[in-house]
């Protein structure tokens, strides 16, 4: 008799965004003539950069010829993309990596969810709260999160570090040792950031406590302020304590194309029960060679084009488009009297619900009365209760119309 992994049975019945989709579909069935504006799920709306499209066409033509055809590629990624990543994303910031420290993937979500494969199931975990649900759910699946505590919505083996308006959304350094800490900056869902001195405190904590930081930098391309780090490796010593995840999804509109990369420094080690230090780079490489067959050649050529002169200009234009949306939305929401956070160095706005409304109650009222979809903050963790997340990835006219509707509604 085959037995199931019963840790999966601990998970909530469905993923947050699936719940939202069900509620929206119910509304559409009962209100078929209403036009809904979706500012919930952080999916992009602008087309791929022209440079990337041209690179994909060229790659397709190569695969159509016997002389230039390619079959299986390296599990870690093609050298042409890895070299472009190192040259453009890290070298200008004084950060140096060898090609074997970069692992190309099919999107940051895969690796943030799979990185636990190389870590013991009984490591303690720390997360900022609210948080991207994948971090928690992937740890539940392997048994690392413990048991869900009724009433609190928290997992027993997870330390929650609240990020609220009371602490300016800056998590306090734990007063105890934690094995693994997840950090995402610019932050999803709050849209807030850490300065270099604030991030340095985390690196110092990790080095002092032998803690592994899993740093999600998927939104670094949206950073506008000079004092906000684009990479954790801008902090001295981070190579000894951190793995960084990057994505082309929001940088270049690759949400449907699927490509990102993970940085696992060779200096980074973790311990066995006997106290031996093991390079995580070696373990991750072994894991990838077994469970991953590499990202497609066509996709990687498109990602390489992101770093071309034309690609950089086109990407900047698209990012400016989304950040213009964020500015309009932030100003529009604040004009209605709502308290809004984020939207300056990130494409997310974290909105405090008025009159003490719960996240889901405000979500439903905004859907039914303004026909605008957001994401209930409580879906990102207990500290998200009383907030709702809006994204700036919509069409420009839709964002303006959404602000008009919300203003008239409130």
From Swiss-Prot:
Keyword presence, Mitochondrion: no
Domain of life of the organism encoding this protein: Bacteria
Reactions mediated catalytically: (2S,6S)-2,6-diaminopimelate + 2-oxoglutarate = (S)-2,3,4,5-tetrahydrodipicolinate + L-glutamate + H2O + H(+)
Coiled-coil annotated residue ranges, if any: none
Binding site for substrate: 15, 42, 109, 132, 188, 293, 389
Cofactors named for this entry: pyridoxal 5'-phosphate
Residues modified to N6-(pyridoxal phosphate)lysine: 250
Keyword Cytoplasm recorded: no
Pathway: Amino-acid biosynthesis; L-lysine biosynthesis via DAP pathway; LL-2,6-diaminopimelate from (S)-tetrahydrodipicolinate (aminotransferase route): step 1/1
Enzyme class: transferase
Residues annotated as binding pyridoxal 5'-phosphate: 72, 108-109, 132, 188, 219, 247-249, 258, 293
EC number(s) stated in the UniProt entry for this protein: 2.6.1.83
GO biological process: lysine biosynthetic process via diaminopimelate, diaminopimelate-aminotransferase pathway
Gene Ontology MF, one: pyridoxal phosphate binding
Alphabetized InterPro entries for the sequence: Aminotransferase_I/II_large (IPR004839), DapL/ALD1 (IPR019942), PyrdxlP-dep_Trfase (IPR015424), PyrdxlP-dep_Trfase_major (IPR015421), PyrdxlP-dep_Trfase_small (IPR015422)
Record's keyword terms, sorted: Aminotransferase, Pyridoxal phosphate, Transferase
UniProt record similarity statement: Belongs to the class-I pyridoxal-phosphate-dependent aminotransferase family. LL-diaminopimelate aminotransferase subfamily.
Function: Involved in the synthesis of meso-diaminopimelate (m-DAP or DL-DAP), required for both lysine and peptidoglycan biosynthesis. Catalyzes the direct conversion of tetrahydrodipicolinate to LL-diaminopimelate.
Summary of subunit composition and partner proteins: Homodimer.
UniProt cross-references to PANTHER family, sorted A to Z: AMINOTRANSFERASE
Protein name per UniProt: LL-diaminopimelate aminotransferase
Gene transcribed to yield this protein: dapL
